[in-house]
Amino acid sequence: MVDGFGHMRQGMSALLTLGMLIGSLLGCGYTLVSAPSDTPGKRLPLNILPFTNQTREPDLERLTTAALRHAIVQSQMFVFTADEASVTRLQGAIRRFSSYPLALDAQDNVVQYRIDTAIYIRLIEASTQRPLLEQEIASSAVYLVSRSTTDKVREDVAAREAALARLAQQFADKCLALLAITLL
């Protein structure tokens, strides 16, 4: 009989562990992909229009729009909608971009750059076309210049592109926090 109770305890322990796992997942807002949209914890729909680039730096609008859309998709507060039927729409414009040397070596060669952007966002209520939020968000990133003598140009371009991606992600994180404060 002790053998039977031992198996029963193991089964109860496994069931209890499974219940705690499911409870903790539900408690932190986890939902199944196929869950209906009217489930508790409904996320707010948000349409993000492609950003415009008012600077001479190419491709910033694509990087910024993609980073923000990815952050929205990953967030637990919002859901990205691609259609014009969304309740709120977000427009953005990259207004300023600057890149300047931050550090020099003993021979006055640049070893580190800093890049800065100022991105203007405007959140609009779709039904009334009334702005809910207008804000300029500043972001910056730093990158090191390669000391290599063979692939210096390629490494510098890769470092700059990585810094631009970090810059776009930093903007997306700041923007997401601002949207959460505004809409929730």
Give the role of each language-model region.
Residues 2-16:
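Bacterial N-terminal signal peptides that target proteins for export
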Residues 15-27:
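Bacterial N-terminal signal peptides
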Residues 26-69, 75-77, 168, 173, ...:
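A structural "domain/chain start" motif
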Residues 39-41, 85, 108-116, 170:
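Short coil/turn motifs at beta-sheet boundaries
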Residues 47-51, 77-93:
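Short beta-strand->alpha-helix linker/helix-N-cap micro-motif
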Residues 75, 89-136, 140-159:
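Surface-exposed short loop/turn segments
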Residues 156-170:
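Individual transmembrane alpha-helices with interfacial aromatic-anchor signatures
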